């Protein structure tokens, strides 16, 4: 996308909007989050220098005001921005509702719930291998990294299960 060093992604911008909404409202408020997502989309809020990338499902949902629920609307957009909810008392239903602002299909919503649970377990002191152990030793060649939410979820868990440090995990994720 030919962006300057230090520019963060659309997913990070939406995660920042999520954090800002929780900070401002003191709770998980889907209407406020959606409004902040729309400000990001239309005005470049939460960016370094304006919007430069957006997934099709996210763009359609923010333009229409309705989360996309088709089988082909299971991109990884909501999964990539859901982490802030792990550090709140958000219920599984609230996690699903936050996903559904843009990605309303059950596959996307449930992937978000699972990832919030993973992050909460890690924050509670469980080790990465305990949380994602079923993927320990799976060859990298069997891990697909792409835009589909389940591929992204599996890739993230594979990185946790097959690395031993933060730096190694991030590098593995980048190189998938």
Predicted regions and their residues:
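Structured, active/binding-site neighborhoods that engage oxygen-rich ligands
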Residues: 1-176
């Amino acid at each position: 996308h030919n962006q300057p060093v230090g520019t963060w992604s659309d997913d990070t911008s939406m995660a920042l909007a999520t954090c800002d909404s929780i900070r401002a409202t003191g709770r998980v408020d889907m209407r406020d989050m959606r409004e902040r997502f729309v400000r990001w989309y239309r005005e470049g809020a939460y960016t370094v220098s304006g919007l430069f990338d957006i997934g099709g499902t996210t763009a359609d949902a923010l333009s229409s005001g309705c989360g996309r629920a088709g089988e082909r609307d299971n991109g990884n957009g909501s999964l990539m921005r859901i982490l802030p909810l792990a550090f709140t008392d958000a219920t599984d239903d609230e996690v699903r509702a936050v996903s559904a602002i843009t990605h309303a299909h059950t596959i996307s919503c449930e992937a978000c719930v699972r990832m919030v649970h993973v992050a909460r377990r890690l924050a509670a002191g469980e080790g990465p291998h305990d949380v994602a152990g079923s993927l320990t030793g799976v060859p990298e060649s069997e891990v697909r990294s792409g835009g589909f939410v389940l591929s992204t979820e599996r890739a993230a868990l594979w990185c946790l299960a097959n690395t031993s440090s933060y730096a190694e995990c991030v590098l593995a994720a980048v190189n998938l």
